[in-house]
């Protein structure tokens, strides 16, 4: 068994994840390497969800009966846990959404409806990057189309890093908002937040960070990031699907208009006009994802019990080992950084002229689950002249043995298409 420095006790951790005991395709042990798409869920989260529905299920904020009060306490307690997890100055800065995509769309639409000085219009510019997930491209394209704003972006270097050589020309006095990913879901690249934020602040632009591939894997401190908005999702960090988070600075949330209207987000309503509740409820129209928020709170408890610093060290050791092993495979090309420095635990690659979908299918027959395609980042594939990639991604329960199984599986793929 391969021993690496900094590894967690994966034997103990894996006992918390029932699905990892599954066998697939005629008895092959499941090797789950698709964690950038979604993580598996520990029993502690599954139990929290079951307990909520069995004992506390009710609508929140709208009743004086015991179930409503208990459900509200659990829901708002989850908000407290998120605020502490990301070191938010105030719990009222934590908005629950259904996923990171909705969080980013919320920011774009708030700015589209805002009054000065936040309004995005035909005289302003929006800056993103070429490595973004479609969820951090399309909302800004829609906003630019609707307002006439100009959309600009940073390109990529050949080794999968952001090209910031022209940062002063891209982020200018016309820039209203800069939105970028903290860790790329396709390249694995960890971006230089400080340099981008510093330039944005120099010109008075707002900063929005997509932390979907960071929040599950490393300590996340929104105050240290010095961003104005930070978005992430729950299902990639051991939580259930259907729950996302948008953190925003209090003064911005007070000034910016709501996007969705409905129950709970109002203060008063007449047939002539409405006034709105303070944040975060101003941005949480209708019945919220109560059970999902409770599940996210349980996931945060679980991650905290292990320690985000330890999870980061574990994944760094795995990534370093995986890069080394993958580069030993003939004809394999890593798309993105080829070292473990300043990168996350998602590695995309091509294998000669074998289409990634064929690679993924043959690996699946061996019980190895990877992701194939554009990974909702088609501009990256266009930049590197490839139709798609195969992506392996790791988490706190991943092991060196699973990386070895992947490498052995790729040899089988090469022989199969030999």
Swiss-Prot record:
Disulfide pattern: none
Keywords annotated in UniProt: Pyridoxal phosphate, Transferase
Catalytic activity: (sulfur carrier)-H + L-cysteine = (sulfur carrier)-SH + L-alanine
A biological-process GO annotation: biosynthetic process
Keyword Oxidoreductase: no
Listed transmembrane segments: none
Ranges in coiled-coil conformation: none
E.C. no: 2.8.1.7
Enzyme class of the recorded protein, top EC level: transferase
Family: Belongs to the class-V pyridoxal-phosphate-dependent aminotransferase family. Csd subfamily.
Function summary: Catalyzes the removal of elemental sulfur and selenium atoms from L-cysteine, L-cystine, L-selenocysteine, and L-selenocystine to produce L-alanine.
Name of the protein in question: Probable cysteine desulfurase
Organism for this UniProt entry: Streptomyces coelicolor (strain ATCC BAA-471 / A3(2) / M145)
Lineage: Bacteria, Bacillati, Actinomycetota, Actinomycetes, Kitasatosporales
């Amino acid at each position: 068994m391969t021993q690496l420095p900094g590894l967690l006790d994966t034997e103990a951790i894996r006992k918390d994840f029932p699905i990892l005991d599954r066998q697939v395709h005629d008895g092959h042990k499941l090797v789950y390497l698709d964690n950038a798409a979604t993580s598996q869920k520990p029993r502690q989260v599954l139990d929290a969800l079951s307990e909520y529905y069995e004992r506390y299920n009710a609508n929140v904020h709208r009743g004086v009966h015991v179930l409503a009060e208990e459900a509200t306490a659990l829901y708002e307690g989850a908000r407290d846990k998120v605020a502490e997890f990301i070191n938010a100055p105030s719990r009222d800065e934590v908005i629950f959404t259904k996923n990171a995509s909705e969080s980013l769309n919320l920011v774009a639409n708030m700015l589209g409806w805002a009054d000065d000085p936040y309004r995005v219009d035909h005289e302003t510019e929006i800056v993103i990057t070429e490595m973004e997930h479609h969820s951090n491209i399309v909302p800004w394209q829609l906003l630019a189309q609707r307002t006439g704003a100009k959309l600009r972006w940073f390109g990529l270097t050949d080794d999968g890093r952001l090209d910031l050589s022209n940062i002063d020309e891209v982020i200018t006095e016309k820039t209203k908002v800069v939105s970028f990913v903290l860790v790329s879901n396709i390249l694995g690249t960890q971006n230089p937040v400080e340099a981008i934020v510093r330039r944005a602040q120099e010109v008075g632009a707002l900063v929005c960070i997509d932390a979907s591939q960071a929040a599950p894997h490393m300590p996340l401190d929104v105050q240290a990031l010095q961003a104005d908005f930070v978005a992430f999702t729950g299902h990639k960090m051991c939580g259930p699907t259907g729950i996302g988070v948008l953190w925003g600075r209090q003064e911005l949330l007070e000034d910016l208009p709501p996007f969705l209207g409905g129950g709970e987000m109002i203060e008063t309503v007449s047939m002539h006009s409405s006034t709105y509740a303070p944040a975060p409820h101003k941005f949480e129209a209708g019945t919220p994802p109560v059970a999902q928020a409770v599940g996210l709170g349980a996931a945060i408890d679980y991650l905290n019990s292990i320690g985000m610093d330890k999870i980061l060290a574990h994944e760094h050791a795995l990534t370093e080992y995986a890069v080394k092993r993958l580069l030993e495979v003939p004809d394999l090309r890593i798309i993105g950084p080829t070292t473990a420095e300043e990168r996350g635990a998602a590695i995309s690659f091509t294998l000669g002229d074998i289409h990634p979908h064929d690679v993924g299918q043959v690996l699946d027959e061996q019980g190895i689950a990877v992701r194939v395609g554009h990974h909702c980042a088609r501009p990256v594939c266009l930049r590197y002249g490839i139709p798609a990639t195969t992506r392996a991604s790791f988490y706190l329960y991943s092991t060196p043995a699973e990386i070895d199984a992947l490498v052995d599986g790729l040899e089988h793929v090469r022989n199969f298409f030999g």
